[in-house]
């Protein structure tokens, strides 16, 4: 893993955005894996501020709630339109269909689509319990796109987007860990002290289903971008190297 520790959350978002921008610039066709939740919002704002040309980019999102139509205000389809797609046109954009009549069949369809496209770069966040996408603790490390039941901690974390906890869906369609690992490059962003324990396990623990993000250690092209709070439980030597790496990142681009 290549770990960068930025001074602020905004700097961490800027690093991740810059990496994405550099990868897609000048390419004829590019497949970009996108995420939802609070982590990527600042980056999507940067896409809009720069009017980044994504006309040659096909996007695939990690997951979608089951039971919500694409136009439901809390669906991830609506999230992506409101925060990115309505202002930054992509060549094509794909998400799982949350209101598909057969979620299992939809998961299989989406797995096939993602595999055929081939993801060049996948953007990730990480949950407090170490989940990536909706791969909760206990998910098989070789899981493909599947239907998953959300843990109470994940539903509670997403409660802020709904009127009541009871309104938060209980299931979702998510890319599996094996699906994510098939991306050519991965950029994971984590900020804030609430993510510190999960980040520590992701980097320092042996790969385990108890902390799904630990599987990323086996990927040859992972960049982890943190702020100081998210890195605070990692070894001091790693924090120091990460801070130096973040400083170099900005210096060579000035």
From Swiss-Prot:
GO terms for cellular component: cytoplasm. Gene3D superfamilies: 3.40.50.1360. Transmembrane segments: none annotated. Pathway: Amino-sugar metabolism; N-acetylneuraminate degradation; D-fructose 6-phosphate from N-acetylneuraminate: step 5/5. InterPro entries: Glc/Gal-6P_isomerase, Glucosamine6P_isomerase, Glucosamine6P_isomerase_CS, NagB/RpiA_transferase-like. Coiled coil: none annotated. It catalyses: alpha-D-glucosamine 6-phosphate + H2O = beta-D-fructose 6-phosphate + NH4(+). SUPFAM superfamilies: NagB/RpiA/CoA transferase-like. The active site is at residues 63, 129, 131, 136. It comes from the Bacteria. One of its GO terms (molecular function) is glucosamine-6-phosphate deaminase activity. Pfam families: Glucosamine_iso. Keywords: Carbohydrate metabolism, Hydrolase. Its EC number is 3.5.99.6. Catalyzes the reversible isomerization-deamination of glucosamine 6-phosphate (GlcN6P) to form fructose 6-phosphate (Fru6P) and ammonium ion. Belongs to the glucosamine/galactosamine-6-phosphate isomerase family. NagB subfamily. This is Glucosamine-6-phosphate deaminase.
């Amino acid at each position: 893993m290549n770990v960068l520790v930025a001074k602020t959350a905004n700097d961490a978002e800027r690093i991740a955005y810059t990496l994405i921008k550099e990868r897609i610039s000048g390419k004829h066709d590019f497949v970009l894996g996108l995420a939802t939740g609070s982590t990527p919002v600042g980056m999507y704002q940067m896409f809009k501020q720069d009017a980044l040309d994504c006309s040659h980019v096909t996007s695939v999102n990690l997951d979608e709630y089951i039971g919500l139509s694409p136009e439901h205000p809390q669906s991830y389809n609506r999230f992506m339109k409101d925060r990115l797609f309505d202002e930054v046109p992509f060549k094509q954009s794909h998400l799982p269909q949350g209101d598909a009549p057969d979620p299992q069949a939809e998961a299989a369809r989406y797995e096939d689509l993602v595999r055929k496209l081939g993801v060049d770069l996948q953007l990730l966040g990480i949950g407090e319990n170490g989940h990536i996408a909706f791969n909760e603790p206990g998910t098989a490390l070789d899981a493909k796109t599947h239907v998953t039941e959300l843990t109470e901690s994940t539903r509670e974390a997403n409660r802020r987007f709904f009127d009541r906890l009871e309104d938060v869906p209980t299931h979702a369609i998510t890319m599996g860990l094996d699906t994510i690992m098939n991306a050519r490059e991965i950029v994971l962003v984590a900020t804030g002290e609430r993510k510190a324990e999960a980040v520590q396990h992701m980097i320092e623990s042996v790969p385990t289903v108890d902390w799904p993000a630990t599987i990323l250690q086996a990927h040859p092209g992972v960049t982890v971008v943190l702020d100081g709070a998210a890195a605070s439980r990692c070894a001091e030597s790693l924090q120091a190297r990460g801070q130096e790496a973040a400083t170099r990142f900005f210096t060579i681009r000035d």
